[in-house]
Amino acid sequence: MSRINLLLLCGGGSAEHDISLMSANYFESSLAKSDQFSVLRVELDKLGQYRTAAGDDCELTNNREIRFRDETKAPWPVDYVIPCIHGYPGETGDIQSYFNLIQLPYFGCESEASSNCFNKITAKMWFSALGIPNTPYIFLHQYDDEAISQAQTALANWGSIFIKAASQGSSVGCYKVDDSSKVAQVLKDAFGYAPYVVVEKTIKARELEVAVYEYNGEIVATLPGEIICDTNTFYTFDEKYAKSSKARTDVVAKDVSVELSEQIRAYAIKAFKGMKLRHLSRIDFFLTAENEILLNEINTFPGSTPISMFPKMLQNHGHDFTEYLSLVINSQLSAKD
């Protein structure tokens, strides 16, 4: 049986570029455990240049092959691609549109689902339309006096707010604000990351995460895990990835009743189905002291770094990551044939 030529594409043009490389390491080591795949790792740098791990400049062509700048190297035909890219152009849905155009099968959510989840405003509209509770919010489309006034009113009404760039991941462009004198500058900073900004009510709650993925034709939702941060912080980019981070994770959250856990999992599956997600996702919730469940966000290509929750929760659920990848890829390629 011939091997599947699998392109592991990583990097991208966002602030999460280096995190994507870390996740790609996990995918690469997992794929290496199977003899089904011939893997070519290619990094997409921040300027849009493709480069192999060996340092060869190359490009992905419309003929579904990697063509090298060094013309003495034969083109490498691509059967399948894993776009291990956090942020732009992976989770935004942009690169999936290109794969669709050239009819190249790929791992993960499709273009529209990726785009809808990455934009926090669009995502919250979908959550509400699906009847899934989420945090109170307003959204702003430009930085001006009216936007500042609206954000200050939200702060006065809610006591504390988060101002977030609508189209960023890993808490990039995300700020907690308790002082009205800081609203204008923070709002300006957030608009520096995205053309739209969402202002959310600060929720004092536990942060729970569910891995939701497809396995043997079934949609699986794991037991909720938990992110536990220092009481004076929220889960910032640095808290997620810095070596000095004080945050810790529990693969299975403690002291969550069976009833609450099942309701969270039901909401997660409802969101996965309703938003037409595919293959994998990490769906994040708040659980308040009053046991109110609020959907926070959906990550359509969750991190797979040494500290990431998705692979840990999948494995804790009894599934092997290499076998999971093989099942998804083979099922997809068989359906294509």
Curated annotation (Swiss-Prot):
UniProtKB keywords: ATP-binding, Cell shape, Cell wall biogenesis/degradation, Cytoplasm, Ligase, Magnesium, Manganese, Metal-binding, Nucleotide-binding, Peptidoglycan synthesis
Cofactor binding annotation: Binds 2 magnesium or manganese ions per subunit.
Cofactor or coenzyme needed: Mg(2+); Mn(2+)
NAD found in the keyword field: no
Family, as annotated: Belongs to the D-alanine--D-alanine ligase family.
HAMAP family recorded: Dala_Dala_lig
Protein name as annotated: D-alanine--D-alanine ligase
Organism: Shewanella putrefaciens (strain CN-32 / ATCC BAA-453)
